[in-house]
UniProtKB/Swiss-Prot annotation:
Name of the coding gene: rplL
Pfam family, one: Ribosomal_L12_N
InterPro entries in alphabetical order: Ribosomal_bL12 (IPR000206), Ribosomal_bL12_C (IPR013823), Ribosomal_bL12_C/ClpS-like (IPR014719), Ribosomal_bL12_oligo (IPR008932), Ribosomal_bL12_oligo_N_sf (IPR036235)
Any GO BP: translation
Any one GO cellular component localisation term in the record: cytosolic large ribosomal subunit
Record keywords, A-Z: Ribonucleoprotein, Ribosomal protein
Disulfide cysteine pairs (residue numbers): none
Protein name: Large ribosomal subunit protein bL12
Organism: Listeria monocytogenes serotype 4a (strain HCC23)
GO MF terms, alphabetically ordered: mRNA binding; structural constituent of ribosome
Amino acid sequence: MALNIEEIIASVKEASVLELNDLVKAIEEEFGVTAAAPVAVAAAGGGAAEQTEFTVELASAGDSKIKVIKVVREITGLGLKEAKELVDNAPKALKEGVAKDEAEEIKAKLEEVGANVEVK
């Protein structure tokens, strides 16, 4: 090879924008490649965007209904009567539009006392 890498880099540094554009086109034609950014690769994952808001749903109270009612009151701030109605009428949404971390925390608290919980 007549030119070493340092000489090629020095030549590229000295070239004008038009000359560099011609160089890119010549390389694309010679090697059958394109200098375009691979945008299609990022879009190929497409589909649904990652979900950021979740709904915590009480599927059933399980065996320890009283403990579940206490935790539901703590989580939702409902009164005793409202929390009992919510638990009795399961499946019901407890909290909507919460972050993933908060939803997982709520689920863990409820499952700890025997409830069946779904995060959607």
